[in-house]
Amino acid sequence: MKENPLASRSDVHIFPDSSRVVALLFVAGQELGGAESRASSVVKRIVALPEADVRRRLKDIIQRFARRHRDIVAIFSQHAERVSNRLDPKADLSEERWLLLGASFTHEYSLEAAAVCNPSIVMHPDQSDVPEGAVRFVMSYRGVGEGHRSSIGFRTGLVGADGEITLDPREPYPMIGTARDGLFHRDVFHARLKAMGQDGESAAYVLDELPVVFSIEELEARLEILISEFDTRQDAHTIARHHRSIAACSYGVHFDEGVDISERVLWPVMSAEAHGMEDARFVLFTEADGTTTYLATYTAFDGLNISQQLLRTDDFISFDASPVVGAAAPRKGLALFPRRINGKYAALTRYDSETNAVCFSDTLGHWGRAVTFQLPEWDWEVIQLGNCGSPIETEAGWLVLTHAVGPMRTYSLGAVLLDLDDPTKMLAALKEPLLIASPEEQDGYVPNVVYTCGAIAHGDILVIPYGVADHRINFATASISALLKAMTTTEHPAIVAKVQHRRLEDLALEH
């Protein structure tokens, strides 16, 4: 398949850097999970070491690792505190022995040992001191490390007036943010409980007395009342357990302002994402009153099951995560529109795993049925379709980058145009891929894949960071006006009829 002249590749590339490491808690015996800890045995051995050996070993460790972390001594102390309950209360440890104890419960994790891929991009919240005609951006990306565990990292840079892309240098010390309790949304609880078959009288007894958005303290107060009435509500303990499991999916993360954005790492906090946070799709969302915030959906993976989560941030310093549920959000790939449409939130979805659709909601946490607007049509998309991030608003309509999978499991990027007022209507589409892996891009962790989780418009320039073979990141640009001009309405009458039939079915179910 020929390269599409609409897309121009940049010479800017991002490769995985195995030296990007964080120091994590390590507990012997629990490396693979499910096994019993050997922590007590390790503690006893540390306590029994001669003081001279302790000093010598600690000195060597600090010499080797201090340059790799901003404050390795503080990390050792934190990890020692985590296992201090295994110490004899009468034990009087020297500072050196305390730090060696912490070091024995610490290991390095290389965030990008396997890959960097699947980026999304938004305008930076700080556009001060930017050269004339340029804009500053924030790019999120998926880092894949040992055990194929994924995290979310960030890069910043500039797009010049001519579309030239420049990346800012990265600071050397990746940092995981501090987790805190999150806020909960009542509609999300109802939706999750309904899916479990547990949204009955007792659930209503808890939730109906809570505000639309509530805290963990407010939830626990209601659950205590429920449990106190277990003699008349025999499912009280079960309902309380379900509420707490849902609450565990909402949390906050905060970074110190002194930590550069290129050092901030969103790392799994809850059990539902223990094996990774994948494919964040960020968008700068604007309300009707002009206020803005950054939103993103991402896929939480526990090693077996996947679910969708929502991120919110105003500044990329503090983040709030909460679950996303509903018929239109069963697996992955929800991408939010950058504003409300007819008073409702809107999102792209691939709820059936192979077609593109739009859904609407009064809230960001619960999405009902979706309306299909695109079925696989061309030979390069016969296996499945999906979106590549949030739509971009143009005068002609919503510009949507899509991905398609064709023969030889080849991933390519396409584009469609949706109606501004009714995005369930597809106005036009590219007949050929906008971007497909070049010969130089075919090889990698997953061959023949190009994929993005979002693009931005800078004037008439469409800026597309994209993952290559699930291993590295490249950039491409395209003229938006030329892209729109190259689109055509679908030419297959049978496909047109199928889409219209599917759309009418979806609309009937919606109402």
Model features per residue range: what roles?
Residues 1-275, 284-334, 339-383, 393-445, ...:
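Beta-rich carbohydrate-recognition and catalytic domains
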Residues 278-279, 307-308, 388:
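Short glycine-rich loop/turn motifs
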Residues 380-388, 448-451:
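Donor nucleotide-activated moiety binding/catalytic core segment of transferases
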Residues 441-455:
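A conserved acidic, glycine/proline-rich C-terminal tail/linker
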